């Protein structure tokens, strides 16, 4: 009830903002008479995401908002609602598509499933490979397909949180067989479900905002998330055993409503695009800087963190190889695209 009431209040606030969100009021927002953007109008950009205060996505979005306002002389104001205030990631993307809000960030691929190709298990092994994949011509092509399917514009594609790890409340996971019989929470993403099923686990789809309580009440035995998410959402309070398997990363598309985007003057689109690029770079930098500290918080709380050897990681990799062929068969990517991604990774 509390969650529904909060969402209701936020939606009332948003309803009052919608009229301003596409405003082309020609009054100047800069002091004095030297505003280079005078006459271009004023705009409000409402953006939602699911992460809490302190998470790299939260911090980088606040930086983006400040940069856009400063560089447009206050003509574009970005209002960021984090921590799932505007709903689940799927609900937020739906709001972007219909124009209730102007943007959202998050690993939401229901409307653009081919972006899932970048979430194949053990696809990349380091930051350079992740950056190469997300900045590739293949990524640009897939984003263009997603834009056409959703009527949105993807103004940045960065990392959603870093390498993803396994955890559960029953026993240590040191080898693939240790996952057999565990009920693992997922966000409904096909490649995560496929991966856990290949390892012998069952899966249950639970919204991110509800995950802490689901783990606490044993609705799910375990979950997978990056260290920064585990630390930020305090999952370590309700999970005992963690395995640093680094099995997957997620793209983090920044969706913007296409109609609103095209209504902006070209000068503002250019500035917002540049600020989004800076935001993505800052986000990835924060992720890399915060992983070890976040992991240490988990250790200090008293949880067991197992770090597999290279040989043990190879066993996990071998166990999920079939996921690649399964994704090709389901049309997430073609065999040629799979080879293109493998070539990109091998070249870095």
Cite the ranges covered by each PLM segment.
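Positively charged n-region of N-terminal signal peptides that target proteins for export
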Residues: 1-4
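N-terminal secretory/targeting leader peptides
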Residues: 23-129, 138, 147-149, 153-348
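Alpha-helical scaffold segments in soluble metabolic enzymes
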Residues: 141
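Bacterial N-terminal signal peptides
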Residues: 8-16
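C-terminal motif of bacterial Sec signal peptides marking the signal peptidase cleavage site
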Residues: 18-21
